[in-house]
Amino acid sequence: MNVSSRTVVLINFFAAVGLFTLISMRFGWFI
């Protein structure tokens, strides 16, 4: 795995975590 692919994976991972955190906060953690 080269550096560019790893960077893309990290960006997608952090984007997914951020989106999940936003949804969790919006629903007050009652999921």
UniProtKB/Swiss-Prot annotation:
<keyword id="KW-0997">Cell inner membrane</keyword>
<keyword id="KW-1133">Transmembrane helix</keyword>
<keyword id="KW-0812">Transmembrane</keyword>
<keyword id="KW-0346">Stress response</keyword>
<dbReference type="GO" id="GO:0005886">
    <property type="term" value="C:plasma membrane"/>
</dbReference>
<keyword id="KW-1003">Cell membrane</keyword>
<feature type="transmembrane region" description="Helical">
    <location>
        <begin position="7"/>
        <end position="29"/>
    </location>
</feature>
<protein>
    <recommendedName>
        <fullName>Uncharacterized protein YncL</fullName>
    </recommendedName>
</protein>
<dbReference type="InterPro" id="IPR049611">
    <property type="entry name" value="YncL"/>
</dbReference>
<keyword id="KW-0472">Membrane</keyword>
